[in-house]
Every structure is written in C-alpha cells, then in structure tokens.
C-alpha cells in the first residue's frame, strides 16, 4: 500500500484503453468507397472463400471490411457504410459492411435475422 506522500508525489495512473476500431474515430459508423473487392481464405481449421472489401474511409483510413450474407452487389467505387466488429478467422479484418445501406443491397430471400442483413419484410 502506498503512503500519502508517495501518492502526492506520484499519483495513480489511469489505464488507457486502446480502441479496437481506430478508423471509426469514435463514431458508430463511417462512409467509405471500395477500392478493391475480393475473396480470401480463413485461418486454420476453417476453410472457405470469405468476401471482403478494401475501403477508403472519410476519416482517411484504408481498412479491410467483411461483407456478410449470401451474395452481394459490391464492386470498385461502390459507396458503403462500415461498422465495427471483427471476423475471428480473418486476420486484419476488424470492420463489417452494413447491408442495405448506401450502395450495398440487402440479402435476397432472407426470412430470419433480416434486420442484420438489410432485408425488407416479405409479403406474408
């Protein structure tokens, strides 16, 4: 336990929490332009072709973000909205593209969890 004199001379330091999504600059989402849309493979033990896009943000950062859902309409120069949220089996992918916002279409024929994929309610 520190004495009062020790604390007067050298106060306790607050631990600094490092942001997991620095490119968002403390905003919930950011707009950006796709510079490259491609597929990549996950870490072991998983196997797939994951769809990702390289995005240049309005904050000046260029980040890799994941395109969730089945099928997408993104190509180079598409304007997208990104949110935080990493993909555990893709190293360096710390952001998600928001489906159904700006140039990104929602997922077709999706019945459950529609709000996460920008899908409108089906006609009964």
Swiss-Prot record:
InterPro entries the record matches: NA-bd_OB-fold, Ribosomal_uS12, Ribosomal_uS12_bac
Modified sites of kind 3-methylthioaspartic acid: 89
GO cellular component: small ribosomal subunit
UniProt keyword annotations, A-Z: Methylation, Ribonucleoprotein, Ribosomal protein, RNA-binding, rRNA-binding, tRNA-binding
Region (Disordered): 102-124
Domain of life: Bacteria
UniProt keyword annotation of Cytoplasm present: no
Basic residues compositional bias, start-end: 109-124
Molecular-function GO term, any one: structural constituent of ribosome
A biological process term (GO) from this entry: translation
Protein's job: With S4 and S5 plays an important role in translational accuracy. Interacts with and stabilizes bases of the 16S rRNA that are involved in tRNA selection in the A site and with the mRNA backbone. Located at the interface of the 30S and 50S subunits, it traverses the body of the 30S subunit contacting proteins on the other side and probably holding the rRNA structure together. The combined cluster of proteins S8, S12 and S17 appears to hold together the shoulder and platform of the 30S subunit.
Subunit structure: Part of the 30S ribosomal subunit. Contacts proteins S8 and S17. May interact with IF1 in the 30S initiation complex.
Family in the record: Belongs to the universal ribosomal protein uS12 family.
Protein name: Small ribosomal subunit protein uS12
Organism: Francisella tularensis subsp. novicida (strain U112)
């Amino acid at each position: 336990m520190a004495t009062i004199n020790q604390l007067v001379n050298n106060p306790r330091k607050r631990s600094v929490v490092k942001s997991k999504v620095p490119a968002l600059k403390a905003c919930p989402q950011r707009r950006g332009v796709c510079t490259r849309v491609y597929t990549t493979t996950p870490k072991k033990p998983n196997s797939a072709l994951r769809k990702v896009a390289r995005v240049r943000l309005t904050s000046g950062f260029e980040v890799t973000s994941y395109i969730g859902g089945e099928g997408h309409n993104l190509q180079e120069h598409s304007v997208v909205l990104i949110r935080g949220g990493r993909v555990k089996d893709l190293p360096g992918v710390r952001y998600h593209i928001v489906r159904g916002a700006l140039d990104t279409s929602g997922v077709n024929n999706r019945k459950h969890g529609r709000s996460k994929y920008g899908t409108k309610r089906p006609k009964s």
